[in-house]
Amino acid sequence: MRGGEQDLRAGLKALQLELTDSQVGQLLDYQDLIGKWTKVYNLTAVRDPVEMMTHHLLDSLAAVPPLRRHLRKTGQEQGACLLDVGSGAGLPGVVIAICCPEVAVTCVDTVAKKAAFIKQAALALKLPNLSGLHARVETITTLFDVICSRAFASLADFTQWSGDALASHGVWMAMKGKQPAEELASLPPTVEVFHVEQLQVPGLDAERCIVWMRCKSAAAGLDQQG
């Protein structure tokens, strides 16, 4: 058994997340790749492998079951497009690409070396559904079904900057620590929060949640359909 594999498999079991042996191997290879690149390019402040497992991999993996439920509920299990904003080392975008091969994942970052890392990860991990993009999210006009972020910006800035890239039926999926009451209160009236989902990250004694949001116009359309 590889280093970190036991902790990873225990975490997957706690999250009730079933992955193939190949996907487990890809996650471990991804962690190794982050470690190698960080020595040269300082991709992440977390360098200890054990800490990287809990604070990066398992933290990102905790978002996969909620994402899968959303895609299943909305009939987007095949062919959905997801944008990970301010992706950095690819968290959670690369993790999602590994766990959800049917989802086309684009990781965007304003730092060239981080976008280059995503492109290298796509090649090294053999992930045809993953792409890296060096750009400001405000310049993206391609439409996405899900736009996610992890430890990125305030909810107001996140939704404003990425708004032009959100499909009419699309949702924002913001990974946060504890429930961000002030940020929620600062959202514009055009954005609706339809769910705040608490997350339990194995081995991490800290609050985590996902704030699910959509445009008010999209919410009105769903209500009319109902």
UniProtKB/Swiss-Prot annotation:
One of its GO terms (cellular component) is cytosol. It is found in: Cytoplasm. It comes from Polaromonas sp. (strain JS666 / ATCC BAA-500). S-adenosyl-L-methionine binds at residues 86, 91, 137-138, 150. The keyword S-adenosyl-L-methionine applies. This is Ribosomal RNA small subunit methyltransferase G. It holds the Pfam family GidB. HAMAP family: 16SrRNA_methyltr_G. Specifically methylates the N7 position of guanine in position 527 of 16S rRNA.
